[in-house]
């Protein structure tokens, strides 16, 4: 019988973490962090079963490379306490095989995150002994991408407005234009 476990974390500079370092560790790879010049080499780490980077359609293709993706994230965040990424650890059912894990994760990530403009870096680990503790690490960008492939704001206020009895929500930027068209905040 499958056992459910989900853990959610935030990768932030305030805690002394780096999105580049986290990605290198989870993908058992070697990545140079352009932000601080530190080379993160986890190529000797064992237990990696599968890894994949998922991008929305509007993402620049070079971000398929996790080094480019996470260095772009590090560059876009300016403060010493920046939230760089969200990380989820999900236990995988031992009753499923590797291809079923991949299919399950791919569908979940596409539907829940990538469809909303988020970039996802996924790794499946099955440490020794194999089949004992299969789990996936899902790293997500904190900022989604807009239609032009640029980082959006982390959180954006929506203003509920009314015009002639009709209600509609606008972001702060959209509201400036909507005011000209007669929309008013409620």
Walk through the language-model features, giving the residues of each.
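N-terminal nicking endonuclease/strand-transfer module with a His-rich metal-binding environment
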Residues: 1-186
């Amino acid at each position: 019988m499958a056992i459910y476990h989900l853990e959610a974390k935030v990768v932030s500079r305030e805690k002394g973490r780096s999105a580049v370092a986290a990605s290198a560790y989870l993908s058992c790879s070697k990545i140079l962090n352009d932000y601080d010049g530190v080379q993160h080499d986890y190529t000797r780490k064992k237990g990696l079963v599968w890894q994949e980077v998922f991008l929305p359609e509007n993402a620049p293709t070079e971000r398929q490379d996790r080094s480019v993706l996470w260095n772009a994230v590090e560059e876009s965040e300016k403060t010493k306490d920046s939230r760089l990424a969200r990380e989820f650890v999900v236990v995988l059912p031992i009753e499923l095989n590797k291809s079923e894990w991949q299919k399950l994760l791919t569908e979940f990530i596409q539907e829940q995150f990538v469809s909303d403009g988020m970039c996802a870096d996924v790794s499946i680990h099955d440490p020794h002994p194999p089949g004992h503790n299969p789990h996936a690490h899902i790293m997500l960008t904190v900022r989604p991408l807009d239609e032009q492939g640029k980082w959006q704001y982390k959180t954006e206020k929506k203003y509920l407005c009314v015009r002639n009895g009709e209600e509609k929500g606008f972001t702060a930027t959209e509201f400036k234009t909507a005011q000209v068209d007669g929309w008013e905040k409620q």
